[in-house]
Amino acid sequence: MLKFVNISKQNEDKISLKERKKYFEEIYINFAKEKANQQASRCSQCGVPFCQVHCPLHNNIPDWLKLTAENRLQEAYELSSSTNNMPEVCGRICPQDRLCEGNCVIENSGHGTVTIGSIEKYINDTAWENGWIKKECSLWTENLKHRQHLEGGLKIHGTVLQAPNI
């Protein structure tokens, strides 16, 4: 429960600037499984989860951290995506340092915050790799009706509504 006392905060490793200049990829190396589980286990499961309170989406952060620490990643992904339509994006671009991580109870006690954003990114990258993310079909499809015989050959599309089975 109080693993944050013995396990120090670790962020994702950053790729060197020299390497990053060669290609346009992410600048951080994703957590390895053991490191993600270890960092998730640092969550103190406090009574009032200030991380969740200060998340604009009110993500159930303590619960998916606990599931990650227990290596139940598919359940962690399902819980993460139940309150967030794009958790794989939020793990990368959300300003966690000012929101969830910035209000972490163990950060305020001097032990370093739980690396919530890095763990969220790890959960969702793992979900993509394992095919847990289900593709949702759009209600709208487009079909090409014909091409105009004018310069530029503009296309005229017809839109067909596929009504959901309700």
Region roles according to the model:
Residues M1-K145:
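Ferredoxin-type iron-sulfur electron-transfer modules and their immediate structural context
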Residues E142-I166:
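N-terminal Rossmann-like FAD-binding beta1-loop-alpha1 element of flavoenzymes
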